[in-house]
């Protein structure tokens, strides 16, 4: 049986918080396999996760102890950003960045939840990183932008 998750958007940190339904309330991302949930999950992706990999194209906040500006969770084999996201998500997130009226936080949470359930439950995707960038990173890139497969090679 697939895991059911509670999906909450923390607008203060631009972080999508996922936790198993019925688990202790916490506002940190969940990591690990969600097909077979262990009894004790790590509360977040470690700050040094992937630190041995190339930083090409990653923002300077990528390995910050506070976490990167990207929304991370384990799931699909592709990286979804404001550039290649379906529907009107790029426009919505751009408006939010500018402080203009856009899709409500509840609707954004629903959008991400639908993506998570589709990938994990319907498609049975392998456990990989999927990234949703909410309004773009506030930090400069380490070097010139380049195709980044860091999150897709986990």
UniProtKB/Swiss-Prot annotation:
Pfam families linked: X
Transmembrane region(s): none
UniProt superkingdom: Viruses
GO annotation, cellular component aspect: host cell mitochondrion; host cell nucleus
GO-annotated biological processes: DNA-templated transcription; symbiont-mediated activation of host NF-kappaB cascade; symbiont-mediated arrest of host cell cycle during G2/M transition; viral genome replication
Location of region: Mitochondrial targeting sequence: 68-117
PTM: A fraction may be phosphorylated in insect cells and HepG2 cells, a human hepatoblastoma cell line. Phosphorylated in vitro by host protein kinase C or mitogen-activated protein kinase. N-acetylated in insect cells.
InterPro entries given in the database record: Transactivation_prot_X
Entry keyword set: Activation of host NF-kappa-B by virus, Activator, Apoptosis, Host cytoplasm, Host G2/M cell cycle arrest by virus, Host mitochondrion, Host nucleus, Host-virus interaction, Modulation of host cell cycle by virus, Transcription, Transcription regulation
Location within or outside the cell: Host cytoplasm; Host nucleus; Host mitochondrion
Assembly with partners or alone: May form homodimer. May interact with host CEBPA, CFLAR, CREB1, DDB1, E4F1, HBXIP, HSPD1/HSP60, NFKBIA, POLR2E and SMAD4. Interacts with host SMC5-SMC6 complex and induces its degradation. Interacts with host TRPC4AP; leading to prevent ubiquitination of TRPC4AP. Interacts with host PLSCR1; this interaction promotes ubiquitination and degradation of HBx and impairs HBx-mediated cell proliferation.
Family statement drawn from the similarity comment of this UniProt entry: Belongs to the orthohepadnavirus protein X family.
Function per UniProt: Multifunctional protein that plays a role in silencing host antiviral defenses and promoting viral transcription. Does not seem to be essential for HBV infection. May be directly involved in development of cirrhosis and liver cancer (hepatocellular carcinoma). Most of cytosolic activities involve modulation of cytosolic calcium. The effect on apoptosis is controversial depending on the cell types in which the studies have been conducted. May induce apoptosis by localizing in mitochondria and causing loss of mitochondrial membrane potential.
Name of protein: Protein X
Species of origin: Gorilla hepatitis B virus (isolate Cameroon/gor97) (HBVgor)
């Amino acid at each position: 049986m697939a895991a059911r998750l509670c999906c909450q958007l923390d607008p203060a940190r631009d972080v999508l918080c996922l936790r198993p339904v019925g688990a202790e309330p916490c506002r940190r991302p969940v990591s690990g396999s969600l097909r077979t949930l262990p009894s004790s999950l790590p509360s977040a992706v470690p700050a040094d996760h992937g630190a041995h990999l190339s930083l090409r194209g990653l923002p300077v906040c990528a390995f910050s102890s506070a976490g990167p500006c990207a929304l991370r969770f384990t799931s699909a084999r592709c990286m979804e950003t404001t550039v290649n996201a379906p529907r009107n998500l790029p426009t919505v997130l751009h408006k939010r960045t500018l402080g203009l009226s856009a899709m409500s936080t509840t609707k954004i949470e629903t959008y991400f939840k639908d993506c998570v359930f589709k990938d994990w439950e319907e498609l049975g995707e392998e456990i990989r990183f999927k990234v949703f960038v909410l309004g773009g990173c506030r930090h400069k890139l380490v070097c010139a932008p380049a195709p980044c497969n860091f999150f897709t090679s986990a």
